[in-house]
Amino acid sequence: MVTATKLEYINRVIDDCLSEDGDALELNGKFIGDEGVEALVSTNRNFDVENLDLSKNKLTWRGAHHLFHSQQFKNLKRLYLGDNNISDKGVKALPNANFLENLSLLDLRYNNIGEDGGMAVVQCEKLRKLQILIFQENPIGDKPVIALATAKAFANLRKLNLYRTDLSVKGVKILAKSKVLQRVKNLNLARNYLNLDSAQYLAKTKTLVNIETLLMFDTQIGD
């Protein structure tokens, strides 16, 4: 239940963190928690926010559900949810969000998201304008990456961060053949279970030819 006290508090936080032009709501590190997000979406305020940063706010799946079922951020273009604990249960509600069709950046790093949650994201067909996808430090494994490689909705991706996501050579092999991800310029595969074969698959790719930055450090690939 959202009390008057909670609404008063969250309105003060919003006033402090909303940019002058109303485009950005920077709540990074405010630790508002699930109840804070519930209060946020329960205000009667109409937001024209394009940039929403909820990183480091002790959010769980409950907070994610409040956000994804809200109707107040329809103009959102960039969403930062890093360093929380929304988990598979939370991210599975993402397809319900009303702002997905305009979203260009989705940062999910450090959220205890596994294979099921990863699949929920890559199977979402509304993310056609997404250019930056950050899965960093979530153990999603190969299956979501393999699905992403053929997911036509993600054809506009420019940056894909798979740092320490339990990715293996199996996923990289399919990724290197992806016709969907031909626009990717920045690919981070560092700290995964990759061997020399992984590097060779990427070196011989005929589709990922626009990559300008490729990170593969701290893997099993030698010098």
What are these regions (language model features)?
Residues 1-58:
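N-terminal segments that cap or nucleate solenoid repeat domains
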Residues 2-4, 29, 42, 164, ...:
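Intrinsically disordered/low-complexity terminal segments and short unstructured peptides
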Residues 6-15, 17-23, 34-42, 45-51, 61-69, 71-78, 88-96, 98-105, ...:
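Leucine-rich repeat
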Residues 65-85:
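Charged low-complexity stretches with an acidic bias
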